[in-house]
Structure formats: C-alpha cells, structure tokens
C-alpha cells in the first residue's frame, strides 16, 4: 500500500473540498493516486466542491452571535464568490450555525493547517506522557499518540468538529452540502470568540450545553 502523506491529503482536500478523513480514506482506497481519489470522492458524493476549490471567494458576511446574557460573543467571517449568494438564505443560515458552533464548541483554529508545529509537538509530548503513565508499552505509544492527535484536531479545529446540530457530520461536510446546493465556493476565513471573564477565576458554567440546548429548542 502506498504511503499517504499529510501533503497528499491536504492537496486532495484543497482540490475537492471534502473532509480530511474522507480524503485520507479515498487516497488509501486508490493506492495514493490523486486523480483516482478525486473520482472516488465524486462517486461517493463527497466532492461537490471540487470545481469550486480554485475559485476566489471575496464576498460573504461577518456573522455575529451573542449567547444569552451577553456572556459569550462570536464574530466569524465566511466568504463566498458573489454578493447574490452572500444574501442567500441558505448561506446566511450556515453563517449563523457556524457562529453558534464556535460559541458552543470553543474551537481554537479554523483548520488543522493553522496549528503550529510547536503546539502539535507540545501536545504530542503531553499525550506520550499520559500513555506511559497509563502503563502502555513504549512500542505502541507512538501509534496511540497519532490517534489521539487526530482526536485533538477534532476538538480544536472548527472544520473537523462534529456539527452541533448533527454530530454525524463535521462542520466541513455541512459546508460542502451548502456548496453543492448554491453552486459557489464557501470558505470560513477567520473567527474570534470572547467569553466574559475568560482567564479570570469564576464559577464554572456549562456554556456549551446551554448553547446546544438553545439550538435544539
């Protein structure tokens, strides 16, 4: 079996808009052949964004969300290609959902490529220490660390998080569904999340559960 590198997965993701794990699985299925992987994703309905990936998305919206009582605030910039789509109900609904996702799930980055090598290495060191403290054999520790790093990405990277309205999908998969529906590239560019009293000693409330409950109400 051909070795599937991170750069191959990244390229396939950029060309198709499919999720990171979907890209990795596709490459594994076709022995690392990029063009066959694209065809595989299209056949599976996971590459609706393929033809849009190279387009420029310079329109869009900055969506805001304030959680009840003004305790959490989010601003997120989501881009599309035309002003017409920026006013589209589905696009605006997506922007609102993503803003609420950020409020509830506390991502630190949009995508895994934004996570610095230093942060990843530091996280790996912590995970190695945890595995060894659990009494795991050293020979399997590295495999365990790689698996836990994937879990780390799903926690801190917005696009890889389970979508708060449907945990069977990732945020990226939801975006791809909108891309297929509206026919334009959609890209989350950046976000900022504020939480009242963040960094200060205070009573701990489960804000994520509150936001999730509000969404389902």
Curated annotation (Swiss-Prot):
Compartments where found: Cytoplasm
Keywords: Cytoplasm, Elongation factor, Protein biosynthesis
Purpose: Associates with the EF-Tu.GDP complex and induces the exchange of GDP to GTP. It remains bound to the aminoacyl-tRNA.EF-Tu.GTP complex up to the GTP hydrolysis stage on the ribosome.
Cysteine pairs bridged by disulfides in the record: none
Major site of localization recorded for this protein: cytoplasm
Involved in Mg(2+) ion dislocation from EF-Tu: region residues: 82-85
One Gene Ontology term, aspect cellular component: cytoplasm
Pfam families listed in its UniProt record: EF_TS
Organism of derivation: Desulforamulus reducens (strain ATCC BAA-1160 / DSM 100696 / MI-1) (Desulfotomaculum reducens)
Database matches in CDD domains: UBA_EF-Ts
Molecular function GO terms recorded: translation elongation factor activity
Name used for this protein in its record: Elongation factor Ts
Family: Belongs to the EF-Ts family.
Top-level taxon of the source organism: Bacteria
InterPro entries: EF-Ts_dimer_sf (IPR036402), Transl_elong_EFTs/EF1B (IPR001816), Transl_elong_EFTs/EF1B_dimer (IPR014039), Transl_elong_Ts_CS (IPR018101), UBA-like_sf (IPR009060)
């Amino acid at each position: 079996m051909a070795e599937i590198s991170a750069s191959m997965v990244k390229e396939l993701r950029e060309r198709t808009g499919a999720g990171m794990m979907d890209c990795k699985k596709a490459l594994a299925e076709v022995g690392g052949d990029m063009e066959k992987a694209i065809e595989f994703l299209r056949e599976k309905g996971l590459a609706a964004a393929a033809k849009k990936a190279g387009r420029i998305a310079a329109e869009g919206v900055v969506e805001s969300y304030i959680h009840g009582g003004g305790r959490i605030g989010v601003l997120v910039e989501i881009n599309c290609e035309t002003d017409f789509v920026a006013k589209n109900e589905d696009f605006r609904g997506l922007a609102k959902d993503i803003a609420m996702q950020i409020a509830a799930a506390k991502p630190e980055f949009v995508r895994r490529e934004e996570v610095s090598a230093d942060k990843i290495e530091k996280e790996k060191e912590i995970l190695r220490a945890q595995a060894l403290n659990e009494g795991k054999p050293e020979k399997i520790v590295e495999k365990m660390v790689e698996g836990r790093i994937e879990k780390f990405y799903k926690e801190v990277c917005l696009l890889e998080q389970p979508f708060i309205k449907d945990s069977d999908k990732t945020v990226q998969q939801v975006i791809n569904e909108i891309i297929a529906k509206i026919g334009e590239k959609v890209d989350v560019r950046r976000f900022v999340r504020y939480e009242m009293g963040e960094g200060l000693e205070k009573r701990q409330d489960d804000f994520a559960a509150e936001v999730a409950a509000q969404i389902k109400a």
